[in-house]
Regions:
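Single-stranded nucleic acid-binding surfaces, predominantly the OB-fold ssDNA-binding core
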Residues: 1-167
Length: 167
């Protein structure tokens, strides 16, 4: 059996009310924005999907601080104006908390496109990597990742098909 690693832990502020997203296998899912602070102090607004039963267990209001654990998921949204990859966090647990912001992700996947090494306008070395992270039932999430500095240099040399672990 294949070892599957796709885990994310986020602490952030609820930035909007959950709204109905979709139903899958009889489960209703709701989407909401979570404002997550980086180490630099910059705030990112991340889309989170949560099943209705999880939201019912954790009643939260706008501005509340939530600790969310789950997986990073992706799907191709086929709109009339074109396709685009939609990335979100699928919440598995969610609690109200007052802890310091603790944000971590762990992925194990396969490089599915040739890495692209480049320098930013500010001179930083980065490498764009598309990682295919397996999940059960022969499915995969395709996650674009940006690697920095020495890690970017090393990843630029990796061929398609290489298994890569990121934390």
């Amino acid at each position: 059996m294949e070892h599957i690693v796709n885990q994310i832990i986020l602490t952030g502020n609820l930035a909007g009310a959950p709204r109905y997203s979709h139903e899958n296998h009889g489960r209703r899912f709701y989407a909401f924005p979570l404002e997550v602070e980086r180490l630099s102090g910059t705030t990112d607004t991340l889309p989170v999907l949560a099943p209705l039963e999880l939201l019912e267990q954790t009643p939260a209001a706008g501005g509340d601080t939530l600790c969310v654990t789950g997986q990073i998921r992706s799907y191709n949204n086929r709109e009339p104006e074109g396709r685009r990859l939609v990335i979100s966090v699928l919440a598995e647990t969610m609690t109200l908390c007052s802890a310091a912001h603790d944000n971590r992700a762990e992925l194990l996947g396969t490089i599915c496109r040739a890495p692209v090494y480049r320098r930013t306008p500010l001179g930083r070395e980065i490498c764009d990597v598309m990682l295919a992270v397996n999940r059960p039932y022969r499915r995969a999430d395709y996650l674009p990742c940006i690697l920095w500095g020495r890690t970017a240099q090393e990843a630029a040399e990796l061929p398609v098909g290489t298994q890569l672990a990121l934390t």
